């Protein structure tokens, strides 16, 4: 099962430098905190619609592969993050199998829990970078995060209903 928003997410083209954009737009795109929390601050009830979750091989993550360790399998999670039932963000998380050890095994068991609720409660979370991308008028971003030094890649596409626009 796929979703058109995830197809567009995978089509994002990334800027080599942070573009000169309106401050409000950059505030959303460069947010270091949880996007789930930001949506809730808008007075919304946040929920997850699961699109796809499970192990994949390298050939299913060509966009992410250069940014992650080369391994035989990766945990892939594709979701829509909804605010009061309306999709505001498409998310794609790729986790190398070597990251899935110790407390990070919980990444496989999030179910309908937003990723941000898990990540941003961890004292071991760090971020290597945020890259801004755009496709067909929609903005997105990707970040390589680390939990206890172990990497994962999160890509987010802001959908037309989101307050970023």
Swiss-Prot record:
GO CC annotations, alphabetized: cytosol
Enzyme superclass (EC): lyase
One protein family per Pfam: Chor_lyase
SUPFAM superfamilies: Chorismate lyase-like (SSF64288)
Main location group: cytoplasm
Biological pathway: Cofactor biosynthesis; ubiquinone biosynthesis
Single GO MF descriptor: chorismate lyase activity
Subcellular localization, as worded in the UniProt entry: Cytoplasm
Catalytically driven reaction(s): chorismate = 4-hydroxybenzoate + pyruvate
Gene3D superfamilies: Chorismate lyase-like
Gene Ontology biological-process entries: pyruvate biosynthetic process; ubiquinone biosynthetic process
Domain of life: Bacteria
Enzyme Commission (EC) number: 4.1.3.40
Residue numbers binding substrate: 35, 77, 115, 156
Record keywords: Cytoplasm, Lyase, Pyruvate, Ubiquinone biosynthesis
Membrane-spanning segments: none
Subunit structure: Monomer.
NCBIfam families: PRK11655.1 (NF008656)
Family: Belongs to the UbiC family.
Function: Removes the pyruvyl group from chorismate, with concomitant aromatization of the ring, to provide 4-hydroxybenzoate (4HB) for the ubiquinone pathway.
Protein name: Chorismate pyruvate-lyase
Organism field: Escherichia coli O1:K1 / APEC
Encoding gene per record: ubiC
